[in-house]
UniProtKB/Swiss-Prot annotation:
Keywords noted in UniProt: Capsid protein, DNA-binding, Host nucleus, Host-virus interaction, Metal-binding, T=1 icosahedral capsid protein, Viral penetration into host nucleus, Virion, Virus entry into host cell, Zinc, Zinc-finger
Record motif Nuclear localization signal, residues: 31-45
GO BP of this protein: symbiont entry into host cell; viral penetration into host nucleus
Superkingdom of the organism of origin: Viruses
Annotated protein name in UniProt: Capsid protein
Organism: Tomato golden mosaic virus (strain Yellow vein)
Length: 247
């Protein structure tokens, strides 16, 4: 017959709990990862002094910004705009020399239909592609020149095989609007923020134009999926960039 367990008062100092057991509330996380979700003021000093690099490698501050505000008429054949056009100068919106790094891109605005189109029963999806052009030359290539589509459908667009080494899709997204008398959704908000760390190189010209790029131009391609009903996009696109140290 098994003996009864001794009273707890007599077992003081003779704990049966294994010393190797881990009852830490953080589970089996490494100590390095346990501080990730903690506020900066509650982290150890070494984590406060070794913060992540705000400034991209090889660049120097301050962080500069350039905005592109425009209303776009988007159709099935697509549209393109260059969002790395930065003029050379000394301001907070200018580049100092030939080289700079676009750290992030912020796109916000809305997609909408006019009064005549929104009364028709249809659904229209607007698709966006953020593309890096590694070897820009002349003028930006049209949507149909860069992308290969099945049955002229932008939702099936992929970069053509012979252009894959030059054009790289960094991000893509879409938004949808619906017209009609009952289930109408005539506008859709757009808000995207991406880290890209794209190193842009210009030639000796000062003007911020696509034709003055020599490496890594950023292009935004837009197209809608409905053949007969175009839509409008009122967008504000901001790029945040740093000048290169080697300028």
């Amino acid at each position: 017959m098994p003996k009864r367990d001794a009273p707890w008062r007599l077992m003081a100092g003779t704990s049966k709990v294994s010393r190797s057991a881990n009852y830490s509330p953080r589970g089996s996380l490494p100590k390095r990862d346990a501080w990730v979700n903690r506020p900066m003021y509650r982290k150890p000093r070494i984590y406060r002094s070794l913060r992540g690099p705000d400034v991209p490698k090889g660049c120097e501050g301050p962080c500069k910004v350039q905005s592109y505000e425009q209303r776009h008429d988007i159709s099935l054949v697509g549209k393109v705009m260059c969002i790395s056009d930065v003029t050379r100068g000394n301001g907070i919106t200018h580049r100092v020399g030939k080289r700079f790094c676009v750290k992030s891109v912020y796109i916000l605005g809305k997609i909408w239909m006019d009064e005549n189109i929104k009364l028709k029963n249809h659904t229209n999806s607007v698709m966006f592609w953020l593309v890096r052009d590694r070897r820009p030359y002349g003028t930006p290539m049209d949507f149909g020149q860069v992308f290969n589509m099945f049955d002229n459908e932008p939702s099936t667009a992929t970069v053509k095989n012979d252009l894959r080494d030059r054009f790289q899709v960094i991000h893509r997204f879409h938004a949808k609007v619906t017209g009609g008398q009952y289930a109408s959704n005539e506008q859709a908000l757009v808000r995207r923020f991406w880290k890209v760390n794209n190193n842009v190189v210009y030639n000796h010209q000062e003007a911020g134009k696509y034709e003055n790029h020599t490496e890594n131009a950023l292009l935004l391609y837009m197209a809608c999926t409905h053949a007969s009903n175009p839509v409008y996009a009122t967008l504000k696109i901001r790029i945040y960039f740093y000048d290169s140290i080697t300028n």
